[in-house]
Every structure is written in C-alpha cells, then in structure tokens.
Amino acid sequence: MVVKPDDKVFPGYFEPGKLKYWTLEHRLLNHRVRIALEEKGGQGWLNGDRGEFIARYPGVRHRPDGIITLDNGAIVAVETERSMKTRARYINIINSHLAASDAGRWHYAMYVMPDDKTKTSLIRLFDSIKTVMRNNVPVPFDTKNREMFLFRTIDELEQAAASGGQ
C-alpha cells in the first residue's frame, strides 16, 4: 500500500512475516510512481487495494495499483508491472480499463515498468491483441481503443518529473 503521513487512511498494523520480497518490490515501485506523478502536480492518489477505492468505483472488475488526477485534470489508473502476465489476463484488464473509461471513471491507464525490456515486451504483447470488448461488443483493438494506454519506465517517469515535462 502506498501511504504518506497525511493520508486519511493509514494501515493499522504491519506483520513482517507476511511481507514477501516480491510484494515489497512492487510496493516500492508504486511509491516511486506516486512520488514522480505528485512531483509533476498530480494529486488525490488512491490505492487500488483500499476499501475507499471499492466504495468510489463500484463495479470495476480490475483494480489498478492506484488512481491519480494529473494537473491537467486527467484521471489516470496506474499499473506497475514488474513481470509479465498472460495475454488472456491483459485482455481482461484492458476490457476493464475500457469499461471504466466509457463510464467516465478515468481517462488513461498508465503502465509503469522497472526497465526497457519489460516495457518493450508489454508493448509487443499489446500489439498482438487484435480484439477487445467495449460495451460488451467485440471491437478491434485499434489506435482509437489503444490511445488510453500509456507505457513508461520508472526512469522515464522520474526524469519527466525532474524536468517538469510530461
């Protein structure tokens, strides 16, 4: 869970024995993404693993790692990817993001990866997807449907934050 001291909800307790290395690495990447986006003027970070997310976005099938509103007003679902999932899993996640976009819940889904290799692999996997569901109808996964998906490495995001660029 990505938290800051002034967050309204703060975890009640911590059990070190239940924290796995992989989970720690994922949460640290989430922290870096949140900090980089907030340095660019983003605000209102909401963790996807909190009850507040479920209350604010009922019916969303896939919960992203976080939601943030950028300084231009765009609402972005943040997905941090340390390793690749199956193609079928990404299709389900894409369908959920498209449905959330159609419902006006967020405008973009930003995938942030630790390195160029993972970024390139994910872009190639997305390129291999030809059909997705939009409004319960199979549609081509063309430029129009792909434009809401952004791909960045954490270094790209942090460098953009440091330079004030997008």
What are these regions (language model features)?
Residues M1-D6, N47-D49, L150-T153:
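Helix N-cap / beta->alpha transition motif
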Residues M1-L29:
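Interdomain/boundary linker segments immediately adjacent to catalytic/signaling cores
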Residues V2, V9-Y13, I67, I75-A77, ...:
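Ordered hydrophobic segments in well-structured contexts
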Residues Y21-L24, R34-V76, M84-R89:
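Active-site metal-binding core of divalent-cation-utilizing nuclease and nuclease-like domains
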Residues L28-H31, I91-H97:
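Well-ordered, non-membrane alpha-helical segments in soluble/globular domains
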Residues V33-G41, H97-S101, F126-K130:
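Hydrophobic, Leu/Ile/Phe/Ala-enriched alpha-helical segments that form helix-helix packing faces
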Residues M84, A88-N92, S101-Y108, M113-Q166:
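Non-catalytic C-terminal interaction segments of nucleic acid-processing enzymes
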